[in-house]
């Protein structure tokens, strides 16, 4: 059954690819080079997932290693429709920071994957772009927590650290905005493969839409709160899709990660989701679904 699902998904992707010329595909740039996670293993998956959709031409910009000359790191953001950050490391040069801000503010797309929301804790505009972040010196001074309580998202301004997680485990993701193009047509809830469940993220949380949450269970070291998992943020004329999922290569092979990442990157690039198909191996509430 899983093999059939993969074949059908590939057939849809090939059909989409056949219908688009190279000039019509979105140009995506994945940024990596430093991370406290295994970016050398996860960037190829992020590239593959986009390429498999048939909708993207993907390039990679790799920064110098820690301690290297960051002044020389000058990705050409403007040559692309969307930038995917798999980066969590040393500060970029002021010129490169300004180039990303200008790119997104002028209508470009940005995708934040997992630990990319740990980066640049002191960079004010980055924190506005990503909405919420963790670690990097973040605290109540960075902005509120967002929690889903009593049927709505609330802003919790209580004092405390920014960013934590319990033990890796499989958990249920619950859609909170089923009308958004990224989540439209997906099940209202599903099981995600074992992953870090980020909690206590905080930040400016301006122009933000929480698409999905997960319960951070105290039994696994969590907060006892329903925490944001999938977010969108409007920044100037640009669009940001922020997924807190994807700690490991295994987590990035979870079908729900693949589908929401593909959809979120389409939306960030264009404001639309061109391929809103739901593969037959998309997980339900009973167990995760992982592709090999």
Segments predicted by a language model, with ranges:
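Extracellular ligand-binding/catalytic regions of CAZymes and related secreted enzymes
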Residues: 23-26, 41, 52, 75, ...
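Bacterial N-terminal signal peptides
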Residues: 5-17
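A glycine-rich, often tryptophan-bearing local segment used as a flexible ligand/cofactor-contacting loop or short
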Residues: 90-181
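Helical hinge/lid and interdomain linker segments adjacent to catalytic or ligand-binding clefts
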Residues: 23-120
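Boundary at the C-terminal end of the N-terminal hydrophobic targeting segment
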Residues: 17-23
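Catalytic beta-strand/loop cores that center a nucleophilic Ser/Cys/Thr
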Residues: 51, 57, 147-236, 278
């Amino acid at each position: 059954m899983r093999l059939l699902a993969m074949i059908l998904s590939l057939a849809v992707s090939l059909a989409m690819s056949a219908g688009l010329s190279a000039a019509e595909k979105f140009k995506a740039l994945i940024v990596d080079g430093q991370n406290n996670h295994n970016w050398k293993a996860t960037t190829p998956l992020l590239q593959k997932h986009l390429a498999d959709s048939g909708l993207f031409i993907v390039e990679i910009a790799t920064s110098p290693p820690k301690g290297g000359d960051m002044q020389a790191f000058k990705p050409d953001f403007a040559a692309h429709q969307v930038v995917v950050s798999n980066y969590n490391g040393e500060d970029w040069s002021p010129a490169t920071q300004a180039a990303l801000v200008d790119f997104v503010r002028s209508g470009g797309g940005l995708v934040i994957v997992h630990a990319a929301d740990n980066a640049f804790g002191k960079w004010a505009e980055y924190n506005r772009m990503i909405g919420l972040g963790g670690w990097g010196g973040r605290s109540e001074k960075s902005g509120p927590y967002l929690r889903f309580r009593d049927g709505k998202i609330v802003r919790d301004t209580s004092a405390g650290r920014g960013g934590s997680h319990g033990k890796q485990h499989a958990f249920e993701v619950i859609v909170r905005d089923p009308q958004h193009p990224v989540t439209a047509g997906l099940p209202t809830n599903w099981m995600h493969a074992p992953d870090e469940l980020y909690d206590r993220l905080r930040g400016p949380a301006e122009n933000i839409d929480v698409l999905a949450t997960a319960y951070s269970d105290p039994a696994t070291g969590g907060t006892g709160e329903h925490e944001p998992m999938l977010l969108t943020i409007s920044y100037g004329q640009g669009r940001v899709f922020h997924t807190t999922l994807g700690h490991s290569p295994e987590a990035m092979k979870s079908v729900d990660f693949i589908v929401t990442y593909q959809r979120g990157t389409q939306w960030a690039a264009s404001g639309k989701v061109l391929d809103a198909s739901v593969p037959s191996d998309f997980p339900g509430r009973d167990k995760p679904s992982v592709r090999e």
